[in-house]
A protein has these predicted regions:
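Signal-transduction coiled-coil helices of two-component systems
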Residues: 6, 91-94, 136
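A structural signal for short, well-ordered beta-strand segments
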Residues: 22, 68, 109-113
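Conserved long alpha-helical elements within nucleotide-processing catalytic cores of c-di-GMP signaling
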Residues: 1-19, 25-52, 61-65, 69-70, ...
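Catalytic-core segments of nucleotide cyclases and related cyclic-nucleotide turnover enzymes
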Residues: 81-84, 114-150
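Catalytic core regions of nucleotide second-messenger enzymes
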Residues: 62, 91-109
């Protein structure tokens, strides 16, 4: 996969890969209030904004329900925090205008950020990012949290 290739290249170059795990805050409420078609539009708009605020070599994938996972090759933890904050601010500033209605939907993101140096550590880095994501949610949502080991 492209992710494995990216991780292997960074491992050979001994460069870190940042892992951003994010969740759309209160997404169930969007679906419950506006319906799943609007929820799908929110997911698509969020992915587009995230991609627009990432570099050409960065990878973005939907990780499940309303979660996204981004791999940022050759990115230090501090640069990853800056990237996540930039994405968070861009999504927060965006208003989705639902086609054929006057409905406007705004969402925010919570992030967990970790770093990985080799392919073998990817699952552990994902678990650390997930813990940091939950810390973001526990501390009020709409924020970026760096995993403790970083």
């Amino acid at each position: 996969s492209q992710a494995q290739h990216t991780l292997a290249a960074c491992e050979r170059a001994q460069e870190p890969v940042a892992l951003l795990l994010c969740d759309i805050d209160h997404f169930k409420q969007v679906n419950d209030t506006h319906g799943h078609a609007v929820g799908d539009q929110v997911l698509q708009a969020t992915a587009k904004i995230m991609t627009q605020n990432m570099r050409a070599g960065d990878l973005l994938a939907r990780w499940g329900g309303e979660e996204f996972l981004a791999l940022l090759p050759s990115t230090s933890p501090s640069a990853a925090l800056e990237a996540a904050e930039r994405i968070r601010e861009a999504v927060e500033a965006f208003t989705l205008r639902v086609s054929d209605t006057n409905t406007q939907v705004r969402v925010t993101l919570s992030f967990g950020v970790s770093s990985v140096r080799c392919l073998d550590d990817l699952l552990a880095a994902t678990a650390r990012a997930d813990q940091a994501l939950y810390a973001s949610k526990d501390n009020g949502r709409n924020r970026v949290t760096l995993a403790e080991d970083q």
